From Swiss-Prot:
The gene is vma-3. InterPro entries: ATPase_proteolipid_c-like_dom (IPR002379), ATPase_proteolipid_csu (IPR000245), ATPase_proteolipid_su_C_euk (IPR011555), F/V-ATP_Csub_sf (IPR035921). This is V-type proton ATPase subunit c. It comes from Neurospora crassa (strain ATCC 24698 / 74-OR23-1A / CBS 708.71 / DSM 1257 / FGSC 987). The chain crosses the membrane at residues 9-31, 54-74, 92-113, 126-151. Proton-conducting pore forming subunit of the V0 complex of vacuolar(H+)-ATPase (V-ATPase), a multisubunit enzyme composed of a peripheral complex (V1) that hydrolyzes ATP and a membrane integral complex (V0) that translocates protons. V-ATPase is responsible for acidifying and maintaining the pH of intracellular compartments. It is found in: Vacuole membrane. Disulfide bonds: none annotated.
Length: 161
């Protein structure tokens, strides 16, 4: 073990892996629950619109996939031998980037999905506007995924221990 590769270096990579999946799944579950409540309330009055308005729930679920992708990439690089502290910090940052972006995107999708679904039941022309706002909310999570993938690609460069 050297100063560049201490014994505790893989801990930071493992925390990045954990942060990626935990925070994105928190956002996805909040978005799913909040949108699902709106769909259930809307379905009482307009059951014909339930399938059409399931879009926010699907978009919230996609947020969890972003965290899964980054988590798998980080866990694939985790080793006990020859793991640099630099790699651990970069992978922690990658996990936090996708995780917190996914958490924010999930909150936005849940709030917009709930209000949009309820509004669509009263005024069907609101559907297109709801979809556009949901796309912008989903892109927030995608930004975190892109940053995490770029960071993780830098972490796996040759580091000598």
């Amino acid at each position: 073990m050297s100063d560049l590769c201490p014994v505790y270096a893989p801990f930071f990579g493992a925390m990045g892996c954990t942060a990626a999946i935990v925070f994105t799944c928190l956002g996805a579950s909040y978005g799913t629950a909040k949108s699902g409540v709106g769909i259930a309330a809307m379905g009482v009055l307009r059951p014909d619109l339930i399938v059409k308005n399931i879009v926010p729930v699907i978009m919230a679920g996609i947020i969890g996939i972003y965290g899964l992708v980054v988590s798998v990439l980080i866990s694939d690089a985790l080793t006990q031998d020859h793991y640099a502290l630099y790699t651990g910090f970069i992978q922690l940052g990658a996990g936090l980037a996708v995780g917190l972006a996914g958490l924010a995107a999930g909150f936005a999708i849940g709030i917009v999905g709930d209000a949009g679904v309820r509004g669509t039941a009263q005024q069907p022309r609101l559907f297109v506007g709801m979809i556009l706002i949901l796309i912008f909310a989903e892109v927030l999570g995608l930004y975190g995924l892109i940053v995490a993938l770029l960071m993780n690609s830098k972490a796996t460069l040759n580091t000598s221990c």
